[in-house]
Amino acid sequence: MAAEKLRDLSQPIDVGVLDATVAAFFVTGSKEERAAADQILRDLQANPDMWLQVVHILQNTNSLDTKFFALQVLEGVIKYRWNALPVEQRDGMKNYISEVIVQLSSNEASFRSERLYVNKLNVILVQIVKHDWPAKWTSFIPDLVAAAKTSETICENCMAILKLLSEEVFDFSRGEMTQQKIKELKQSLNSEFKLIHELCLYVLSASQRQDLIRATLSALHAYLSWIPLGYIFESTLLETLLKFFPVPAYRNLTIQCLTEVAALNFGDFYNVQYVKMYTIFIGQLRIILPPSTKIPEAYSSGSGEEQAFIQNLALFFTSFFKFHIRVLESTPEVVSLLLAGLEYLINISYVDDTEVFKVCLDYWNSLVLELFDAHHNSDNPAVSASLMGLQPFLPGMVDGLGSQVMQRRQLYSHPMSKLRGLMINRMAKPEEVLIVEDENGNIVRETMKDNDVLVQYKIMRETLIYLSHLDHDDTEKQMLRKLNKQLSGEEWAWNNLNTLCWAIGSISGSMAEDQENRFLVMVIRDLLNLCEITKGKDNKAVIASNIMYVVGQYPRFLRAHWKFLKTVVNKLFEFMHETHPGVQDMACDTFLKIVQKCKRKFVIVQVGENEPFVSELLTGLATTVQDLEPHQIHSFYESVGNMIQAESDPQKRDEYLQRLMALPNQKWAEIIGQARHSVEFLKDQVVIRTVLNILQTNTSAATSLGTYFLSQISLIFLDMLNVYRMYSELVSTNITEGGPYASKTSFVKLLRSVKRETLKLIETFLDKAEDQPHIGKQFVPPMMESVLGDYARNVPDARESEVLSLFATIINKYKATMLDDVPHIFEAVFQCTLEMITKNFEDYPEHRLKFFSLLRAIATFCFPALIKLSSPQLKLVMDSIIWAFRHTERNIAETGLNLLLEMLKNFQQSEFCNQFYRSYFMQIEQEIFAVLTDTFHKPGFKLHVLVLQQLFCLPESGALTEPLWDATTVPYPYPDNVAFVREYTIKLLSSSFPNMTAAEVTQFVNGLYESRNDPSGFKNNIRDFLVQSKEFSAQDNKDLYAEEAAAQRERERQRMLSIPGLIAPNEIQDEMVDS
């Protein structure tokens, strides 16, 4: 094949053959030709000398694809090897690229026809600039500006280069350059911006060329967020921009520039200019888009440019208000313009576009939070009274600060009232609502959660809660007014009722209790009434879903009103017979949610009742659940289990449990009775399904009853183990006789489902039961043979991973009391599971995760058992841990790393410290650096850092009393372990990262030692190293900052807990006292 000769780079490459190879890959080739071309092109890219051919290729090809290929090779060299190249080679390449750019952009025809090529050359030039400027190319900016003045097309391209440069340095630099380099480039751009500024103003005042003006506005946009402020406010720049705003061709670019200026925030120094800018802007906007315009309709029928204008307008207003609303509200002559701007923004918020709405919603959320905080935090009795729902303010209570807060609230009262209307009209769907309208207008059960909608609901809910706190009465009035219009039919529509009820449910907990009670009595009464008077299955399903959602959000109200609670629960039982998709599921979910928060109410005799509700419910149990699917019945059993769990009298509790389990127990007894006559009976698929269903019902009840499930599980436990053993043997026989495909048959799958559910039931019970040793003694010994022995005997495909998680739960629960059993557990599961999971990274994913969870439980609570392992066994454990954290599946890698940390800490404190670390220290360090610098393992960053910190602190901890190195293989002794580890690490990293200099590696390792006792400094050192080593370049590096983000989330949760309603009553784990 002619293309093979391309591999010989000792002479100039044959550009014709290269063109044909590139064309075969991108355009003309068959599947085989494309694969062969791909391989050759990859090999050429990987060849370190290929870049020397780039100029030759660019000069001799007319193929754009070939040019791009050559520039791709060059880009790799610039990114990773530029500083290592000889000066003359660097300068030669730099000059060549600059000349080609000037040549192609100096005349209109070539600039337009070669636009894509010029753009790519610009990117290459900027990559070079990032390395060489300012130190090695001091004249770069003056050269660029001088070139721009020679022709309008060159000037247009120079603007494109300047834009790219700003974006590269300021927008895309995190994770690609060290903090020091970014700082240096920013300072250089700042100091030389005068030339760029003059060039931009000159073009905007003198040029008539549309493309050039657009390129200039676009470049300016990239610089406005960070340049010295004098260039904006002490020159004619703002006036010039505002002059371009009314011109349709420049409107969108200009408003983007004005938005950047609006988003600057640096104190009060330029307030006058901001007020002037806003005043002129609103004046021009009223002509372009008159206030009477129906913006949502205009948007839906507008062109792409017009829609972009509305989007940009939203960004401008939200940015300006975010930083300068205080200036506008404190300047009396522009207050009316501020309100006009807010009116525009509210109208834009009704636009049917998710992105536009997100922009508006984020701002509304921050504005109402700010108004609420001022109102919440001023230590003013009037304000506090208002927060408790005591309105209006009492005369004489308002001091100076309170007065300001009140005036501000007064100023915004009208826009805030309109904003409440917006939030109620556009409220997003909460997670609990399962009934939705599909694209054909049918009411169906939701099949997939939409995460974007859930995020939007969370922000809207929070916003509406702040709005409710600012004026409870207006919130209540607007909601009841809209509900009346639903009843009268004036505004009846599924969507209107949905958004209204979602809004009502979302403000739960934000009103004072007496106001909430009054409000809800009306809401629930009206919704139940609406359900009665409305005809049509779909309509009823929509109303039912809304009733269920609203009542599920207000447990405090239900606990205080037994009659309403009983009515609501009976209504849910009614809905459990309604077969419309989603209604039964939602009824069962809502029932569970209500019972969890009101359980005590169901086990006491209420006024006017003859017996507790739970007893009445158990009498009619069979009728209530007769139309439910098995999974819904399981949910129902969990709910009733919650009620029974609230009964404090043990005798009554056992009686209720007996009545609850009567139906499944009766069926179980029949099946076991038949099996005693003939074991074949248990092989019938209908029987197997019934057994599975009975076990699932038991698991559901055990989930909510915990310890109190003891009498029930004791009743079925031994029979259940016998069924388990028998089904297990059946599975093994089928797989042994039928080969690997047997495990895919429905019969084997069904048998295994029973085995898994048995294990899940035992695990659920032991996990939920209070820590009572006698329970462990009763249940664990019988399982040693039935479950563990069975696992060991089975063929790999028949082993249940749940065995591993069950024993992990048992060890986590009973801790050191399990010490004597660990050798048996090891014997049964260790070797045979390792053989299953160490052949590759894919097979048996469930076994992997659960195996390492079991090992972690043993390492944490039964560590002495690990010390007793033989050296080969311990080596297997350590190899398996390394195997785990090398895994790209996040859960497995994290479990492995957590387990490793437990091992490191425990061995450090044990008598085997020297022996363990001499065997494994270097291997662990090497493996951790390997995953740390692999971008697939970014999520493990926090744990990688903790392991390295543990290793670097060890040599000086006093735990080691012998050298880590092997004296027989190391030619000279080190003064101490610290010196050895330092040198070993430097050697390890130098050989792994040849692109880093010895000085850089040594500096990094010294930094690790200096910061080893400072977790934050240690972590930052490693972050900088990852950037410097080029392992984590232009990618999303948020995983490296995950810990900081988690701390921020916890602070936010604490803040939310302090504001009534912000965390929904259902989400607060407070065991809601409801006696």
From Swiss-Prot:
Chief location: nucleus
Expression by tissue: Expressed ubiquitously, with higher levels in stems, inflorescences and roots. Present in mature pollen grains, unpollinated pistils, and 2-week-old seedlings.
InterPro entries in the record: ARM-like (IPR011989), ARM-type_fold (IPR016024), CRM1_repeat (IPR041123), Exp1_repeat_2 (IPR041235), Exportin-1/Importin-b-like (IPR013598), Importin-beta_N (IPR001494), XPO1/5 (IPR045065), XPO1_C_dom (IPR014877)
Gene Ontology annotations of biological process type: embryo sac development; mRNA transport; pollen development; pollen germination; pollen tube growth; protein export from nucleus; response to heat
Gene Ontology CC: nuclear membrane; nuclear pore; nucleus
Ranges: HEAT repeats: 91-130, 135-171, 232-267, 336-373, 388-425, 474-513, 563-600, 612-649, 682-719, 756-793, 798-835, 894-934
Compartments it resides in: Nucleus, Nuclear pore complex; Nucleus membrane
Listed SUPFAM superfamilies: ARM repeat
Disruption phenotype: Gametophyte defective when both XPO1A and XPO1B are disrupted. Abnormal pollen germination and tube growth, impaired female gametophyte development and embryo lethal. Impaired ability to withstand moderate heat stress (37 degrees Celsius). Enhanced sensitivity to methyl viologen (MV)-induced oxidative stress.
Gene Ontology MF annotations: nuclear export signal receptor activity; small GTPase binding
A Pfam family per the record: Xpo1
Residue ranges of every copy of the Importin N-terminal domain listed in the record: 37-103
PROSITE patterns in the cross-refs: IMPORTIN_B_NT
Membrane topology of the entry: Peripheral membrane protein
Alphabetical UniProt keywords: Developmental protein, Membrane, mRNA transport, Nuclear pore complex, Nucleus, Protein transport, Repeat, Translocation, Transport
Complexes and interactors: Interacts with RAN1.
Family: Belongs to the exportin family.
Job of this protein: Receptor for the leucine-rich nuclear export signal (NES). Binds cooperatively to the NES on its target protein and to the small GTPase Ran in its active GTP-bound form. Required for the maternal-to-embryonic transition and during gametophyte development. Involved in heat-induced oxidative stress basal resistance.
Name listed for the protein in its UniProt record: Protein EXPORTIN 1A
Organism: Arabidopsis thaliana
Gene, per the UniProt record: XPO1
